[in-house]
Design a protein with these regions (language model features):
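C-terminal capping alpha-helices of c-type cytochrome domains
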Residues: 75, 82-102
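Solvent-exposed, polar/charged alpha-helical surfaces in well-ordered, non-transmembrane soluble domains
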Residues: 21-25, 29, 65, 69, ...
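Surface-exposed patches in mature extracellular/periplasmic domains of secreted proteins
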Residues: 42, 80-82
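Periplasmic/extracellular electron-transfer cofactor-ligation site
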Residues: 17-49, 98-102
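Sec/Tat signal peptide C-region and signal peptidase I cleavage site
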Residues: 11-15
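Gly/Gly-Pro-rich "capping" loops immediately C-terminal to redox-active cysteine motifs
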Residues: 39-68
């Protein structure tokens, strides 16, 4: 089910929009200590600090630009991420792929 959701939402392998599959891999490595990154894991974890990626994707008005700005800015409750521009594009594409399709 998860693979089908990713495949359905992946528009291009590597474009300005980023690569959904690569973004999922980066998110699992760099983000899952504090966030729920997988769509099927929506229940709260004991040590969850940040919002689930599914919830971020479904914030009204959330855009790729907003996610990119967030990922390149420092935040007191979040470790400073050192991601390449491609990784930022990939994570952004992955997060946006988790939007509910209404």
């Amino acid at each position: 089910m998860f693979g089908a959701a990713l495949a359905a939402s992946a528009f291009g392998a590597k474009a300005q929009d980023g690569d959904v599959w690569a973004g999922h891999a980066v998110a699992r490595e760099a983000c899952r200590a504090c966030h729920i990154v997988d769509p099927e894991a929506r229940s709260p974890r004991i040590f969850e600090i940040g919002p689930a990626f599914h919830d971020i994707a479904n914030i009204r008005g959330m855009t790729a630009t907003a996610i990119r700005v967030f990922l390149t800015s420092s935040h007191p409750k979040m470790p400073n991420l050192i991601l390449t521009p491609d990784e930022i594009a990939d994570v952004t594409a992955y997060i946006l792929s988790l939007r509910d399709h209404r």
